[in-house]
Amino acid sequence: LNHESRMETVQTAFWVVALLVVLALMFDFMNGFHDAANSIATVVSTGVLKPAQAVLFAAFFNFVAIFIFHLSVAATVGKGIVQPGIVDTHVVFGALLGAITWNVITWYYGIPSSSSHALIGGISGAVIAKAGTSALVAAGILKTVAFIFVSPLLGFTLGSLMMVAVAWIFRSFRPSRVDKWFRRLQLISAGAYSLGHGGNDAQKTIGIIWMLLLATGYASAEDKSPPSWTIVSCYMAIGLGTMFG
């Protein structure tokens, strides 16, 4: 190839990567949009915040998570579930398109679902279609699948225990006094939930963009963390999605 042909190839590759990054950020936006109701349901239903105030509140904490959470989830998605060398632009496109499509379908029909599960399933399905099940990292997949099942059970157990404990502790208090304090405490719980949502789910998109950059040579396998712009843009995208949700 002459110099002009090489430059054209690099430029084409760059635009393919850029479009896939935009698609990943669209998924991240949809994640925030799709899951916004989970973050604000309690504070809106009890009248602690108006809907517009609640989404701004949740979006703020989605983004603030950037300063608190370590990038361990991004590392798992980016390097821990697929064998090196398997991922290419086609795999990333298939994974993102599948996850976005499922998110839109479940949102439209009002079906409770997880954007995280959709993304992990999309990645796994695209990789299996390309190279078979041997291309998956068994330890990473098993850990992810285990937590998919453990999380709701753990949430149910802890929620039940907390409800029993709170009812017992405040059994002799006047309802008006309890209501006053718990309306304030709901802000803390909603903020903590939004913080966790941003810190966990934004990192999954960071991970898939990092996976894409590694596959296309725009990042090195020796890098300990993804580029800063991916981190900032993903946290902004999920925050904006929540704001519009």
Where are these regions (language model features)?
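Multi-pass alpha-helical transmembrane bundle typical of ion/small-solute transporters
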Residues: 3-245
